[in-house]
Structures are given as C-alpha cells and as structure tokens.
C-alpha cells in the first residue's frame, strides 16, 4: 500500500483539511511537515466543526499525529489548540501527538518582528503576523530555539542571549523595546514540562511505522503557489510547500512519501497581496465569495476569488510530481450559466502557458479564457460520479485534460462523507 502526500496546488485554502480528514480515516499516521499556525483549516465531522492551525488533522480521528521538524511551532498556540480541541471532546495525549524534538520554536519576539515589519513596509506581503517568517530566518541562521533545548535550561540561557543579540538591532531599527532574556527564559520554562511530554525523535517514530507497513499521510499546509522558491515571490510564505518538503520536513526518505495528491478548488482564491491573473471583481466573483464562504479561518480576511486557472495548476502538477488531484467546492459553481477556465496568459503581444518568475511579467499577465457551459442542477452532497449532471462531468473532464492529471477525489460539500472517490490514493 502507498503512503500519500497531500499538498495544496493553488494559493492555499483549497480544502486540504477536509480531504486530509477524509483520508486520515484510512491512514495510521498523519504528519505535518512544514509551515506553522499561519494556515488554518476547518473540519466538519458529524456536524461538529473543528478549527485547526497547527495540529495535524488526524487528531480528530484519533490517529497518531506527528508535527515534523519542518514545522515552526508556537508552543503557546500549540497548547491553546490542544486545550480547545480537548474542550470539544478530543483528548490530545502524548500517545496521540508527537512533536519533533528538533522542530524550531516561534517566540513572542518573532511575532513582534513580523508585525512591525509589515506595518513599516510600503510593499505589503500579506503576512498573518504570527511570526512564521522570522522564525524560519532564525532557523536558517542557526540561532533558533528548538524543542529539545527546553530540556536543558543551562544551555538554553546562552542560546537566548545569542538570539536576543541578533534581534536587538532589528527591534531598535523598528522602534520596538528591547526583549528581556529572563522573561523569555521564565516563560519557556513554565511551559517546558507540558511541551516536552509530546517531544520525541519524530523521524525515528515514522521510520518504525514505515517499516511496520503502517499507512502514513503527509499533510501539507498553504499551497504550491506560496512556496518560497516556486511561488509568486515575494508574495509567498517562508517555507517550501511543495511535495518534496514532505521528506525533509518529516525525516523520511523521498521514497516513503508515496502518492502525491494535489488539492484544487474548482475555482481560484487567494488571501493577501500578490499577482492573481484570473481574479474577478464582478457578480461572479461575489457569488464565489458568498456561496463558497471565502473567509480565512485564522485571520477572518476575505479571500480574493477568480475563475479556475489551469495554467497555475498545471505548473503545480509539474513542480510537485502530482499523481492525481482532489477537486473541491464543485458545488459552489452550481447556478452559474457560463463558466470560464484560464488556459493561458497574454503578456504584451505574446501568449504564454506558464506564469513567469518576474514580477513585471506577472503583473502584466492577462488571462486567456475558454468558456464552458455551466449548470443549474445542484451537485451539493453528491457521493457518486453518476449523481453529477452532464455539464458538471464535462467540467471535471476538461479540468483533467488541461492540468495533465486525473481527478482522484471530488468534494461536493464541507461534510466529510460528501466525497466521490474516483481513484484510491492509498492504492498508488
């Protein structure tokens, strides 16, 4: 049986939470391998709504859930999320949740820096202000505080001093007060016992599970178009969101990551700043926003909406090595008489079939559309392909042709069971 790696193939918010929740019912282990608590997702299980940002979706199913070394972890947020889910009846014990002992921590000074930079910048990136970017900077700069450091208070003190020496200059330049080393140390020591109860060498646990033949589901956050290398830079997140990160961010070899499932909305959305060639500002855009309930789980920010962009998704299919996609929110298109799919970009007097890396070309790109007849019948709640109307089926098939990948799963509502299985990712 194959393991499965789930990645967003657009700008995030594609419905990964529901799909991972659906797949985790058939998995033994669920792993987060990058990002932080900047990308929330909503799960609806038996009518109960769970909002997660850092915990792997498998916790709701009672599956072994791992926060890998590629994730940057705000320990205060993690404990808050654990408590919130516990209040909903799901106890998150150390037997259920494993936190990689070599994962790096997000600290209050990272949030301060993130928010101050965004406020001072004339070019807004659209950061959530939760400290993810600055935490990754410290990780790459080899000055981060890691989970394992909490177990050695004496060694932690000089690490904090070194970290604050770096941040001191940054804070002064942004008009922020000096951070207090003792206060940070005391705050970390206060939560250390509880955080350390979840800490283990995650790579070792995963290696043992893999060798035992257990099904592993790798859960990506954000989307491929937000990847720090392959996304619409600089309007991106601070981590690699592509499928290749599943290996590096979990401690497992590339051969273990299995079937790559890209999650794709039947239209396109984006939060924050940055290029969006197929964005809509008309009544159709309002329809997608309203019917699709396009508001960020974490931030409450309205998402920008547009037609399905096959150019971008085809690019994501190539970069991630996607074997199949889960097409979500098909039901949001119900009632639209005419649908459009972006099949290319006009830049000056040229038409291209990919999104260039340069900001000037990205800003100049105007969409080339193909029109498809819509439908008035409802697709909401459909659980079989034969339940879909002819035009909805034509739309799905055309999407497959344009992106160069088959639709493996089709989602027709936020409910877990309103999912059509067309190809089992766990069968490879």
From Swiss-Prot:
Cofactor note: Binds 1 Mg(2+) ion per subunit.
Domain of life: Bacteria
Binding residues annotated for substrate, in chain numbering: 297-303
Keywords (A to Z) from UniProt: Cytoplasm, GTP-binding, Ligase, Magnesium, Metal-binding, Nucleotide-binding, Purine biosynthesis
Residues given in the record as GTP binding sites: 12-18, 40-42, 303, 329-331, 411-413
Pfam families for this protein: Adenylsucc_synt
UniProt GO molecular function: adenylosuccinate synthase activity; GTP binding; magnesium ion binding
Known cofactor(s): Mg(2+)
Residues engaged in binding IMP: 13-16, 38-41, 128, 142, 222, 237, 301
Pathway the protein takes part in: Purine metabolism; AMP biosynthesis via de novo pathway; AMP from IMP: step 1/2
GO biological process: 'de novo' AMP biosynthetic process; IMP metabolic process
Record-annotated active site: 13 (proton acceptor), 41 (proton donor)
Residues bound to Mg(2+): 13, 40
GO cellular component: a single term: cytoplasm
Subcellular localization, as worded in the UniProt entry: Cytoplasm
Reactions that this protein is recorded to catalyse: IMP + L-aspartate + GTP = N(6)-(1,2-dicarboxyethyl)-AMP + GDP + phosphate + 2 H(+)
EC number: 6.3.4.4
InterPro entries: Adenylosuccin_syn_GTP-bd, Adenylosuccin_syn_Lys_AS, Adenylosuccinate_synth_dom1, Adenylosuccinate_synth_dom2, Adenylosuccinate_synth_dom3, Adenylosuccinate_synthetase, P-loop_NTPase
Family: Belongs to the adenylosuccinate synthetase family.
NCBIfam families, alphabetized: PRK01117.1, purA
HAMAP family: Adenylosucc_synth
Function: Plays an important role in the de novo pathway of purine nucleotide biosynthesis. Catalyzes the first committed step in the biosynthesis of AMP from IMP.
Subunit structure: Homodimer.
Protein name (database record): Adenylosuccinate synthetase
Species in which this protein is naturally found: Caulobacter vibrioides (strain NA1000 / CB15N)
